Amino acid sequence: MNARGALGRYGEDLAARLLAEAGMAVIERNWRCRAGEIDIVARDGDALVFCEVKTRRSPGFEHPMAAVGPVKADRLRRLAEIWLDRHGGPPPGGVRIDLVGVLVPRRGAPVTEHARGVS
């Protein structure tokens, strides 16, 4: 795995831990199909959450939370629909798409930010 892949994996590990600490149950990670990948699928009570994780090393780059624009949001919605079609449809509590941004500074602890219902 290259450095970029390792950074992304580290960010996803932190995001999964953050979601679990918030009371969610992570049920799948890095789900792939021909249309793309969903980083994390989790259950939050009766709701199903599709979570995109964006990790950046330094604040000199675009903030991780700014990395999901309209095109990316549309793709996430399409991926969620495909996942639901393959797994029996939406749960009674509904579906939402969340974003976890992870900023890994050169020194100090990483900073995570969780935005619920971004799309």
Curated annotation (Swiss-Prot):
GO molecular-function terms, A-Z: nucleic acid binding
A Pfam family reported for this protein in Swiss-Prot or TrEMBL: UPF0102
Highest taxon of the lineage: Bacteria
Gene3D superfamilies the record matches: 3.40.1350.10
InterPro entries tied to this protein: Restrct_endonuc-II-like (IPR011335), tRNA_endonuc-like_dom_sf (IPR011856), UPF0102_YraN-like (IPR003509)
Family: Belongs to the UPF0102 family.
Record-given protein name: UPF0102 protein SGR_1878
Organism for this UniProt entry: Streptomyces griseus subsp. griseus (strain JCM 4626 / CBS 651.72 / NBRC 13350 / KCC S-0626 / ISP 5235)
